C-alpha cells in the first residue's frame, strides 16, 4: 500500500516539476481537467463494469445505503463542528464544506483503483452518486450561507457525463449484462487508464502555482485536515462496521471519505464570491498529507 501511494505521489511530483518548468499550467490544466472529468473518468467507470468479472450487483443497494447514511451524518458534522474550529463566523460554511466533501471523482477513483483494483471503481462510482448530489445541494448552501435561496440544486448535475456513466455502469451490473464486445470495452479501458496519471499530474501542476505561505497553512487548516483525513474516516469505519455493513463496502467507503478536500469547494467559492484563501490552503494541505494518511488508514482493513 505504501508503495502504491509513493507511486501516486511520484506522479504528483512530476506534475509539480512540469508546472514549474512551464510544460503544464493555465489553459492546458483547465483543458486536461475537462478531459479527465468528462471523458477519461466516465470511461474508467464504464470499463469497471465491462472488463473482467462482473461486479456484484448485490452490493449496489448497500453502497447507496452506506453513502446516504454517511452524508446525512456528515451534514450534521458540517453545520455543527466548524463553530469550534474557527473564530470567523464567515468561514464556518467553507470549513463545513471541507469537512464534508472529499475529492472523490478526481482523486478517489485513481486511489480506489490502485488499492482495490479496477473493478472497485464501479463501487466508488455508486458511492459518488450520493456525494455529487450532496455537493451541489448541501455543499452550495454551506458555501453561499443562504438557506432561503432555492436555486442551490442544478438539475443538470444529475445528467452530467460522470453521473450518466455511473447510471449506465449500475444498469449493466444490475441487469447482469456480460460479454460486452472487446471493440467497446477495450477502447474504454485504454481511455480510462489515462485518468490516474492525468489527474495526479494536474494536482501536482496546481500545487506548483501556489505560494509558500499557502503551503504552510494555519491552525484552522490543520485542525480541519485532522478531522478530514483521519478522525472522520476512522469514526465512520467503526460505525459502519458496528452497523453490520459488508466489510468490503465499508473499506471502500472509508477510503472514499478519506480523500482530500474536493476541488469543487474552490469552484463554488469563486462562483459565490467567497474568499478562496482557506479552501485553497486546506485543499493543498489535505492533498499532500493524504499521501501518508491513506496508507495508514488501510491498516484498519487488516485488523
Where are these regions (language model features)?
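Alpha-helical transmembrane segments of multi-pass small-molecule/ion transporters
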Residues: 1-303
